């Protein structure tokens, strides 16, 4: 029976062996269907129809079942002769790779035939009934059974195909069994067993070839891969790139071939400017940006944003910044509030919390790990020295492995410093973010350490170290390096705003901390020392820093000046400290001759005679005074002193007005009053020019006085020690010697000269006064009734000696000593004299005022 219309494909029939049944093979024709449950009709013809020869054009064979699990059934139509005998049995084996397990014997005409065959590891039920040959999937991979009575009711679509089953080897063929204990499968060929072993989960089954080196642990599926792996231990790279100039080597030929593909594509994209070639168009576009300034055609449409971009992808990435609030992926780790616009970025961020770094650099002796593949690839550029980002500035030539590094480098060519330190008080700026990061670590390390503040009152800069503060003072405030330790010393003086009375104006533009210091610069105890100095009546004024706070009135270079010493003020022991009285400069009107009082005699003096010890640094007279500019800051409120007119005649330097008030006794000496009337001005008390040394009588008379004004070129530790010792002795003695000293005091005036042995004042005579400061400073009231104003020029005739310095009292300007004016604030230490009873009848002397000139102070 021919059914050419329903044939699936032509099939060839194999050679017959000994008149036996022919082996049916699958034809090469197209299949009629591919869906599950679809039937295929095949026409099979027996050898009796046309003789023993093969008839390939008439014997189609069934195709193997499709891979879908659906229980495909194959209906094979056979033309079987009526008088078929037993030797006409057919062995149905459609596929050459399948081995039949049962031979289906030919039955008599009209009899039913059933059996089981295995095709591609799948058991099929074979039924031949009344000329119709049926193949159907078995319900389960069970042993083959020949039960014709149970199989007629089996429908083709009711069976489920099973892919796994033992491969039965044909008789006489070697069998390769699976070595797994729970697997009993066997295969006819070795490569089939290898493929089957890959399905098992054990390491031995998947990778049986282990590396023999200790500590390696690698295993492979084939011996070739193990051999290739062993070459990596020996650092062997036998496969070299043949392209000239490349020189790269590889461990396998596969890696070499993959590398060669890159060389083949290098010449595909060529730059028209520099003729450089690139493997991809994207790399060519990236390269061309270095030749031309790229256009930015893509502009952000968000309201208020005017940014433009080169590519669309860059614009899209920017747009996410405007819509981050709409969809954000927040980190769920406790204490972390970071948000990301993509889930993949959040996933990478979470690895920073978990410590997972799955991407490891395989370079030699590197071992760096990363949270993402992009960071690993970026890191590998360092090993390959891939500096693809080159600075476009002509003459620079620097290249970088990362684009952000090039961007940060480009800022250095602009000369700007956009990165500013956010710490309050720190104004440091940097051109690179990395420099700011390094700088910020200093603030983190010095959180608990005290900060050094600039000692200049108008500057609020803070510094982490004293070295930085000193460099700032020298660079910004033009101070000398040797003055910085004196500026650092804290001042125990009360600010001028607290000391000034309602009728006085506050000091302006003067830094008291820079002018005065209560302790030496190298002293370690500042607070305790200042309290002790105030209690003892001793205070040291550092006048070496005066020039830096006077606005340039003094020369900055003091090489031509003499040695500069501190100013030591020793208050009288009988006078309690008070902040409401002028500064006490002395307690007696006794005047000394030049060279008549030495430092050695000061130790033997009575403490009552030394009421105030003042050490002023003055310039050597042998040196020329530098040219000075008249000061515009000095004002003389009230009446103008007489010495001002005398000073202006020479035009050398202005005067620093320091009125000195001389309080007289109730019964002044007539000679003094007569001298004042004849001169109509300040008392002409001038130091004698005699250089003879006074005798013991003069010293005893000096010691009998109530006090004196003594000038010494001190300032060293020896001078301070003498001052302290004198005050201590004076406190121990008390005021007993002061009462008897007033009775023996005498005053004589001869030709306008006062001789120290014969000139004495009363018990309550003293030098007190108020220093005048620049404009806006302290005001000096007009001389009250009963007060005399004298002019005291400070001179130094013998600076190299150890003797005392002379003090001249004269209303006239010295012809051979130039004056030197210093704008010196005075709120240092104020003392007041206790007014004794009967101190009401003071004689009034109307004197406009006078000055004290401090020369060569810096």
Curated annotation (Swiss-Prot):
It is found in: Nucleus. There is a cross-link at residue 661 (Glycyl lysine isopeptide (Lys-Gly) (interchain with G-Cter in SUMO)). Keywords: Activator, Isopeptide bond, Metal-binding, Nucleus, Repeat, Transcription, Transcription regulation, Ubl conjugation, Zinc, Zinc-finger. Its main location: nucleus. A zinc finger (C2H2-type) spans 176-200, 209-233, 239-263, 269-291, 298-322, 329-353, 359-383, 389-413, 419-443, 452-477. The keyword Flavoprotein does not apply. GO terms for molecular function: C2H2 zinc finger domain binding; LRR domain binding; transcription coactivator activity; zinc ion binding. Pfam families: zf-C2H2. It comes from the Eukaryota. Residues 59-68 have a biased composition (Pro residues). Disulfide bonds: none annotated. GO terms for biological process: positive regulation of DNA-templated transcription. Residues 624-634, 681-692 have a biased composition (Polar residues). The keyword Repeat applies. Residues 1-73, 85-108, 142-175, 624-652, 671-714, 727-751 are annotated as: Disordered. Sumoylated at Lys-661 with SUMO1, SUMO2 and SUMO3; sumoylation enhances the activity of the transcriptional activation domain. One of its GO terms (cellular component) is nucleus. Signal peptide: none annotated. Self-associates. Interacts with ZXDB and CIITA. PANTHER family: ZINC FINGER PROTEIN (PTHR46179), ZINC FINGER PROTEIN ZXDC (PTHR46179:SF5). Belongs to the ZXD family. Cooperates with CIITA to promote transcription of MHC class I and MHC class II genes. This is Zinc finger protein ZXDC. The gene is Zxdc.
């Amino acid at each position: 029976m021919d059914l050419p219309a329903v044939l699936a494909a032509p099939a060839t029939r194999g050679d017959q062996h000994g008149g036996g049944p022919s082996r049916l093979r699958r034809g090469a024709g197209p299949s009629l269907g591919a869906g599950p449950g679809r039937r295929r009709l095949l026409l099979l013809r027996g050898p009796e129809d046309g003789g023993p020869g093969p008839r390939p054009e008439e014997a189609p064979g069934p195709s193997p079942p499709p891979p879908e699990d659906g229980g495909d059934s194959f209906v094979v139509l056979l033309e079987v002769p009526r008088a078929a005998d037993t030797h006409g049995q057919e062995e149905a084996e459609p596929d050459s790779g399948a081995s039949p397990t049962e031979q289906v014997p030919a039955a008599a005409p009209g009899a039913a035939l059933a059996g089981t065959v295995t095709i591609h590891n799948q058991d099929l039920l074979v039924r031949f009934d009344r000329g119709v040959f049926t193949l159907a999937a078995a319900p389960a991979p069970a042993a083959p059974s020949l039960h014709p009575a149970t199989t007629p009711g089996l429908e083709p679509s009711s069976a489920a195909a099973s892919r796994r089953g033992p491969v039965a080897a044909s008789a006489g063929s070697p069998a390769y069994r699976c070595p797994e204990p729970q697997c009993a499968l066997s295969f006819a060929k070795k490569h089939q067993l290898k493929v089957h072993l890959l399905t098992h989960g054990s390491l031995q089954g998947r990778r049986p070839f282990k590396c023999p080196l200790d500590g390696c642990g690698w295993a492979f599926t084939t011996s070739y891969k193990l051999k290739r792996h062993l070459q990596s231990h020996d650092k062997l790279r036998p496969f070299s790139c043949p392209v000239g100039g490349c020189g790269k080597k590889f461990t396998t030929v596969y890696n070499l071939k993959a590398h060669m593909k890159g060389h083949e594509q290098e010449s595909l994209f060529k730059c028209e400017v520099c003729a450089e070639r690139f493997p991809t168009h994207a790399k060519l576009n990236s390269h061309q940006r270095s030749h031309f300034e790229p256009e930015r055609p893509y502009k952000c449409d968000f309201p208020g944003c005017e940014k433009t971009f080169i590519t669309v992808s860059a614009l899209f990435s920017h747009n996410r910044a405007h819509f981050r609030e709409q969809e954000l992926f927040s980190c769920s780790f406790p204490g972390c509030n970071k948000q990301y616009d993509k889930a993949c970025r959040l996933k990478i961020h979470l690895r920073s919390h978990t410590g997972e770094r799955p991407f490891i650099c395989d370079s030699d002796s590197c071992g760096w790990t990363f949270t993402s593949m992009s960071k690993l690839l970026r890191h590998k550029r360092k090993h390959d020295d891939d500096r693809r980002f080159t600075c476009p500035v002509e003459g620079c030539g620097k290249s970088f492995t990362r684009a952000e590094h090039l961007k940060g480098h480009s800022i250095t060519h602009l000369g700007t410093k956009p990165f500013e330190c956010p710490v309050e008080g720190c104004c440091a700026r940097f051109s690179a973010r990395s420099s700011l990061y390094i700088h910020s670590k200093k603030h983190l390390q010095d959180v608990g350490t005290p900060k050094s503040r600039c000692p200049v009152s108008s500057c609020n800069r803070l510094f982490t170290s004293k070295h930085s503060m000193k460099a700032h003072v020298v660079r910004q405030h033009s101070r000398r390096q040797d003055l910085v330790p004196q500026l650092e010393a804290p001042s125990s003086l009360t600010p001028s705003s607290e000391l000034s009375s309602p009728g006085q104006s506050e000091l302006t533009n003067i830094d008291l901390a820079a002018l005065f210091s209560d302790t030496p610069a190298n002293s370690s105890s500042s607070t305790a020392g200042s309290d002790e100095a105030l209690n003892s009546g001793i205070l040291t004024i550092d006048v070496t820093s005066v020039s830096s706070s006077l606005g340039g009135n003094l020369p900055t270079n003091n090489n031509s000046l003499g040695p500069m010493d501190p100013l030591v003020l020793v208050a009288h022991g009988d006078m309690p400290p008070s902040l409401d009285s002028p500064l006490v400069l002395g307690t007696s009107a006794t005047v000394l001759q030049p060279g008549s009082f030495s430092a050695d005699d000061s130790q033997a003096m009575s403490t009552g005679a030394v009421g105030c010890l003042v050490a002023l640094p003055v310039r050597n007279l042998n040196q020329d005074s530098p040219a000075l500019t008249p000061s515009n800051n000095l004002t003389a409120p009230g009446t103008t002193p007489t010495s001002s007119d005398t000073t202006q005649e020479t035009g050398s330097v202005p005067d620093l007005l320091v009125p000195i008030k001389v309080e007289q006794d109730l019964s002044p000496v007539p000679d003094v009053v007569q001298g004042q009337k004849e001169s109509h001005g300040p008392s002409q008390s001038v130091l004698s020019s005699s250089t003879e040394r006074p005798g013991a009588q003069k010293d005893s008379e000096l010691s009998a006085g109530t006090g004196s004004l003594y000038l010494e070129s001190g300032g060293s530790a020896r001078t301070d020690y003498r001052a302290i010792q004198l005050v201590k002795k004076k406190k121990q003695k008390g005021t007993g010697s002061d009462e008897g000293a007033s009775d023996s005091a005498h005053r004589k005036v001869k030709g306008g000269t006062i001789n120290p042995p014969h000139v004495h004042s009363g018990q309550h005579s003293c030098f007190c006064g108020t220093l005048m400061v620049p404009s806006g400073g302290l005001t000096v009231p007009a001389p009250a009734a009963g007060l005399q104003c004298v002019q005291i020029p400070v001179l130094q005739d013998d600076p190299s000696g150890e003797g005392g310095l002379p003090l001249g009292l004269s209303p006239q300007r010295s012809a051979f000593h130039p004056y030197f004016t210093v704008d010196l604030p005075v709120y240092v230490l104020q003392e007041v004299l206790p007014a004794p009873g009967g101190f009401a009848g003071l004689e009034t002397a109307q004197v406009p005022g006078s000055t004290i000139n401090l020369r060569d102070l810096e």
